Amino acid sequence: MRTIKFFFAVAIATVAKAQWGGGGASAGQRLTVGNGQTQHKGVADGYSYEIWLDNTGGSGSMTLGSGATFKAEWNASVNRGNFLARRGLDFGSQKKATDYSYIGLDYTATYRQTGSASGNSRLCVYGWFQNRGVQGVPLVEYYIIEDWVDWVSDAQGRMVTIDGAQYKIFQMDHTGPTINGGSETFKQYFSVRQQKRTSGHITVSDHFKEWAKQGWGIGNLYEVALNAEGWQSSGIADVTKLDVYTTQKGSNPAPTSTGTVPSSSAGGSTANGKKFTVGNGQNQHKGVNDGFSYEIWLDNTGGNGSMTLGSGATFKAEWNAAVNRGNFLARRGLDFGSQKKATDYDYIGLDYAATYKQTASASGNSRLCVYGWFQNRGLNGVPLVEYYIIEDWVDWVPDAQGKMVTIDGAQYKIFQMDHTGPTINGGSETFKQYFSVRQQKRTSGHITVSDHFKEWAKQGWGIGNLYEVALNAEGWQSSGVADVTLLDVYTTPKGSSPATSAAPRTTTRTTTRTKSLPTNYNKCSARITAQGYKCCSDPNCVVYYTDEDGTWGVENNDWCGCGVEQCSSKITSQGYKCCSDPNCVVFYTDDDGKWGVENNDWCGCGF
């Protein structure tokens, strides 16, 4: 087989605005790139997804399936055209890749290259190792290549046996964009299967261990994903089965240790109702469920605590840390992956409702707040920052000098401090803490988080790349409870319409769902559903909130539109009918509205 020079490209880390919020996109959604749109990235069903196209030209699409499945199609048969689509698990660079005792991946795919301009393509496991706080360890982009067309590496390597198959392993140096932001020279690690295939099991952790045996530096694991990539080519990859897991099938899962992503987070909603506990040597659980990150943590000074996950981002935390230097936290929200500066996000909103109280104290305190970090990846002169937007507190008022500002119609005192301690980078260092403290306490409401970032920037405070936005319950030498019954984090303001991806309207599926319709009903506002929210299942639901978009209810711990959804006039003007069931199954959404299927033809969902 001929040897062709192969160009490995990393997707430049720019998050498409419409793809964040509420945990990302949903099954059945088709994301497209081309004509100036180069990337979509987010989380759906508990699995990360990304589609990326170089700005050299071409086009492509990625349709999300249930779980981690997806279908990718690309046409990048142009000079230096490069496309990729991948799904998997984000591990958040919490610990070294070889510290995970087991990571497995099962997949089935149909993959073929349909065109080429002296190019190539491949189907592979893909990810990164970050060198957070690890001296002498390189930044690494890794590939476990299972199938390919028109490419065989000519690099010197070594043959190893993993999962009963022969793989050639080698490494290269590459200069280009990275997940840290900017461009730099980094390592690429490869395992290339000598017998191609498009389905099977991969013990990913065995590849990491084999690379380590060769003396290759192993950093903190950022992600494990199945990737379809094309260079100056066109093709299709239909991944009909994909599972990534950290507990070997047939074995009993061990308790989660510090920094471990629980295997239960891999399946989207499988951890709903699960109670995580800390104490007696167990000090942390961390992962993703229902598209939202979660963490419970307890200092090793003593005490205990628990966190019970609800649907969406909701949770209940209870803690007993009324001991000397006892410290507890529990939080849920969205991970933004330090992809770009916090102030580069036009809008980030957070809605919440909680019952919060401190039940005991050993000269301690507690607080309910929005919490996160700014990382200083590739940003000279910008500090590492831990930030707090404090909404309610007990037995704590900072005496720091600050400035009063008005955000969301309320007064906040803003100030910063220096602090030395453990960080998300690993190890201990001195970093900045930014604070916004609400002067009128509350336990529910709306927070325009992005306005706090912008206000801090106005003061000349350094703003780094946004790592996360989470609602946090924290106790210091205290005991208490926080029951968060409503929590939503989103990047499209309510009342605006997020971008949609075009898709062909072709289907042979039919479905019927019946639901009685009250004689007297209100119409659910199209301005609400245009933001991705559903209409409440009860057309006569209780109205919690009213604004220019319509009337808002709450269902399954998330916002919904009160009333029956309207059938779009843009659909009926094309000659299609409104579906006879006003609560029909939505097969497709575009600028015209929501489309259902009835009698083997398209119809408009609503009434």
Swiss-Prot record:
Residues 248-272 have a biased composition (Polar residues). The keyword Zinc-finger does not apply. It catalyses: Endohydrolysis of (1->4)-beta-D-xylosidic linkages in xylans. Its EC number is 3.2.1.8. GO terms for biological process: xylan catabolic process. Residues 496-514 have a biased composition (Low complexity). Keywords: Carbohydrate metabolism, Glycosidase, Hydrolase, Multifunctional enzyme, Polysaccharide degradation, Repeat, Signal, Xylan degradation. It comes from the Eukaryota. Residues 35-242, 280-487 form the GH11 domain. The active site is at E141, E223, E386, E474. It is an enzyme of class 3 (hydrolase). The keyword Repeat applies. Pathway: Glycan degradation; xylan degradation. InterPro entries: CBM10/Dockerin_dom (IPR002883), ConA-like_dom_sf (IPR013320), Dockerin_dom_fun_sf (IPR009034), GH11/12 (IPR013319), GH11_AS_1 (IPR018208), GH11_AS_2 (IPR033119), GH11_dom (IPR033123), Glyco_hydro_11 (IPR001137). SUPFAM superfamilies: Cellulose docking domain, dockering, Concanavalin A-like lectins/glucanases. Residues 248-284, 493-514 are annotated as: Disordered. It holds the Pfam family CBM_10. One of its GO terms (molecular function) is endo-1,4-beta-xylanase activity. Residues 1-18 form the signal peptide. Residues 523-563, 566-606 form the CBM10 domain. Gene3D superfamilies: 2.60.120.180, Cellulose docking domain, dockering (3.90.1220.10). Belongs to the glycosyl hydrolase 11 (cellulase G) family. Hydrolyzes xylans into xylobiose and xylose. This is Bifunctional endo-1,4-beta-xylanase A.
